[in-house]
């Protein structure tokens, strides 16, 4: 979860179905890379990790991986509080890449995740370029980026979350190409959420600032959470398959996976 939302309550036990479904979608999309890193006692970076919930969950499936979470919005005791909350020796949290370099010299990441983070950065190219030039990734590093889809859906929620933009498959693909990253696969997912957001933007949206979002205040029962998570997961899989078949079903999110091209 983004730190803007997470700081309202780090210790929530109930996670929003979108978070659960996105976790399982990442496990599906990145299973080969995660398995490879696990077999080699590798390192995986989550750049813009927020409350680090996702990589903490991933570590339960892949215990041999050292997960590194970096977020420039960590403040005060945030890192200490999260380490105490998760009690996970596979989780390494830092405010910057430089802080990571100080603790771990000459480490190359098997994979780098940027999950719903680059939309928060005014200069997305410079942000990813800094990672490329950091000597922590190379041509063998797999890169996975997820972002919110369709600028036409930009709403008060995006303003609240401090988003600069939303993306399409084409704009995300061009970002990769401009940075010398070869796109292996990209797709939209979460069609049902796209439909509901389209309706919201068209008929209900206002610029009223929100104190929190559905992610931060989710408090439904385990049954309801599991049910909606299951529906969203089916939705995501249908969207991924349809895009592979060239059907082009839209979604509220879009991802691209690739690696640095030979130079």
Question: Predicted regions span which residues?
Answer:
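Conserved N-terminal segment of class I S-adenosyl-L-methionine
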Residues: 1-107, 111, 115, 125-128, ...
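Short, glycine-/aromatic-enriched active-site segment of Class I SAM-dependent methyltransferases
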Residues: 8-11, 145-165, 169-174
């Amino acid at each position: 979860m983004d730190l803007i939302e997470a700081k309202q309550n780090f210790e929530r036990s109930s996670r929003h179905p979108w978070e659960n479904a996105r976790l399982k979608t990442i496990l599906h999309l990145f299973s080969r890379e995660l398995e490879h890193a696990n077999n080699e006692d590798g390192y995986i970076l989550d750049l813009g990790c927020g409350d680090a919930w996702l990589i903490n969950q991933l570590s339960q499936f892949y215990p041999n991986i050292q997960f590194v979470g970096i977020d420039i919005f960590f403040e005060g005791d945030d890192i200490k509080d999260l380490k105490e909350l998760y009690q996970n020796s596979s989780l390494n949290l830092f405010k910057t890449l430089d802080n990571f370099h100080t603790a771990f010299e000459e480490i190359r990441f098997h994979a780098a995740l940027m999950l719903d983070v680059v939309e928060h950065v005014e200069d997305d190219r410079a942000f990813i370029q800094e990672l490329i030039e950091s000597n922590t990734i190379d041509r063998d590093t797999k890169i996975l980026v997820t972002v919110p889809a369709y600028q036409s859906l930009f709403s008060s929620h995006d303003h609240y979350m401090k988003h600069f933009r939303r993306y399409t498959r084409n704009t995300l693909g061009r970002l990769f190409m401009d940075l010398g990253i070869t796109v292996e696969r990209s797709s939209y997912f979460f069609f049902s959420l796209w439909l509901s957001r389209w309706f919201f933007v068209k008929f209900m949206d206002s610029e009223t600032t929100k104190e929190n979002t559905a992610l931060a205040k989710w408090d439904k029962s385990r049954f309801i959470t599991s049910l909606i998570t299951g529906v969203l997961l089916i939705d995501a899989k249908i969207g991924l398959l349809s895009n592979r078949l060239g059907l082009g079903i839209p979604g509220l999110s879009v991802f691209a996976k690739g690696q640095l091209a030979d130079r």
